């Protein structure tokens, strides 16, 4: 179907978001057309602000307005434990349970040879550097329980073991093939409490 160019561009833009296909993008574009102009301007500004005002923490890799992030700056945190997660949504999920008091390291992905993503393509080198300089006694690997997450956890475990740091994995109360961000607080809390050494 032929749309006016501004609508076509908006549909194409919405389709760049994960999980948004042509029909949903079309619905969103026409909904945007029906919105008040002030709301559209505010929406567009929020999109631009996310890219301009946020950065990644130079210590852990988590999204932040200030570098280092509020978690790395918090002196009350247990600095002997680092929980390694795949992405920022996992940090947010872990923080919701309000039980984990250590630090984080965000990989921004997982090892996936099928997608051409190797260890050097995610935030693993900075993790190893961090472990050499910080006084860390335990590394909790909180990757998603899927093939890529398991591969990433095994790779990191093999790298870290020679350093002499205890490496643990979340308990397997999490469903295989699921994503950490969708787990409820109770499941995450039990997974942290029941973590096992690798």
Curated annotation (Swiss-Prot):
User: What Pfam families does its record include?
Assistant: RecR_C, RecR_HhH, RecR_ZnF, Toprim_4
Which UniProt keyword terms apply here?
DNA damage, DNA recombination, DNA repair, Metal-binding, Zinc, Zinc-finger
What GO biological process term is on the record, naming one? DNA recombination
Give the matching SMART domains: HhH1, TOPRIM
Q: Which domain of life is it from?
A: Bacteria
Q: Could you say which residue ranges form the zinc fingers (C4-type)?
A: 57-72
Question: Hey, what's the signal peptide range on this chain?
Answer: none
Q: Which stretches make up the Toprim domain?
A: 80-175
In terms of InterPro entries, this protein maps to: DNA_Rcmb_RecR, Hlx-hairpin-Hlx_DNA-bd_motif, Rcmb_RecR, Rcmb_RecR_Znf, TOPRIM_dom, TOPRIM_RecR
Q: Keyword Zinc-finger: yes or no?
A: yes
Give a yes or no for keyword RNA-binding in this entry.
no
Q: Which GO terms describe its molecular function?
A: DNA binding; zinc ion binding
Q: Which family does it belong to?
A: Belongs to the RecR family.
Q: What does this protein do?
A: May play a role in DNA repair. It seems to be involved in an RecBC-independent recombinational process of DNA repair. It may act with RecF and RecO.
**Name of the protein in question:** Recombination protein RecR
Q: Please report the organism this UniProt entry assigns to the protein.
A: Staphylococcus aureus (strain JH9)
């Amino acid at each position: 179907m032929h749309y006016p160019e501004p609508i076509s561009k908006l549909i194409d833009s919405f389709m760049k978001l994960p999980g948004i296909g042509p029909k949903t993008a079309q619905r969103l574009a026409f909904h945007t057309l029906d919105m008040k102009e002030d709301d559209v301007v505010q929406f567009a500004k929020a999109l631009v602000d996310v890219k301009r005002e946020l950065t990644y923490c130079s210590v852990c890799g988590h999204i932040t307005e200030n570098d280092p992030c509020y978690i790395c700056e918090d002196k009350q945190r247990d600095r002997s434990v680092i929980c390694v997660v795949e992405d920022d949504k996992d940090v947010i999920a872990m923080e919701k349970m309000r039980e984990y008091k250590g630090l984080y390291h965000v990989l921004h992905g997982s090892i996936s040879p099928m997608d051409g993503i190797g260890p050097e393509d995610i935030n693993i080198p900075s993790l190893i550097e961090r472990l050499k300089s910080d006084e860390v006694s335990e590394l909790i690997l909180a990757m998603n329980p899927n093939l890529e997450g398991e591969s990433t956890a095994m790779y990191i475990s093999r790298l870290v073991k020679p350093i002499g740091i205890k490496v643990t994995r979340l308990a397997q109360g999490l469903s295989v093939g699921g994503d950490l961000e969708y787990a409820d607080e109770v499941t995450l809390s039990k997974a942290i409490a029941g973590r096992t050494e690798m």
